[in-house]
Amino acid sequence: LNIKCQLENLLSDQQDKTAISLNETYKRCKQWTDKTLEDIENLLTFSVDAYGLKACIQPTDIRELLTQITTEYRQNNSIGKQIDIQTEISPTVPLAQVDPLLLYSALGNLLGNAIKYSGTKVRIRIGCRREAKKWILTVQDDGYGIPPEEQKFIFQEYKRGQRYKGDKQRKGFGLGLCYVAAVVKAHHGHIQVNSDGKQGTEFIIEIPQRKAKRRKARS
């Protein structure tokens, strides 16, 4: 509501449009946005802890889902980095039985981390293929990497990399990967991370293939 009020003030004819006034309004909007995101993270943490995540499985076009994610991050580059996102999707990928909303948010989280934990330039590759009876999704970047000693607990709550603790520019690392792991678990899948700790990180998600549920014939 506070953000809405500030934005309405910006659009109002009576609003002072001087540079100083606009700057103060933008600062208030950012403060309330940060507070809202913090509240959402706390709510997500409570929900995951108390209830877990339940996937709403439905036929999903993985190619379209990945296209939507990459397009969103290419267009909404508010931090001014040079971002190169490439996709490697098998041309014969059929519909997958997954929860599109949960999977979208999980992959978006990994993509956001790849951008956040990198220098001024970052190259990201997102892959998708079907192998045997499972889906394999990968998110690979050439960012800072994750030290081997930290990789074993990064999917636990609030376990944020030591090198980024106290860094206000890189919030949310602790809950984000915990949430991603919860999404994968809700799909009865598995997630792993590969990194030499110096440069680059790859997350590999494996989700078992499900058969589409047949509708019961009406009697």
Q: What are these model-predicted stretches?
A:
Residues 28-36:
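Short alpha-helical segment of the dimerization/phosphotransfer core of two-component systems
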Residues 51-56, 95-98:
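Conserved micro-motifs of the catalytic ATP-binding
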Residues 58, 82-94:
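Conserved catalytic submotifs in the C-terminal HATPase_c
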Residues 114-115:
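Short helix-loop "hinge" at the ATP-lid/N-box region of the Bergerat-fold HATPase_c
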Residues 121-133:
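Short beta-strand/loop element within the Bergerat-fold HATPase_c
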Residues 146-158:
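Short conserved segment of the HATPase_c
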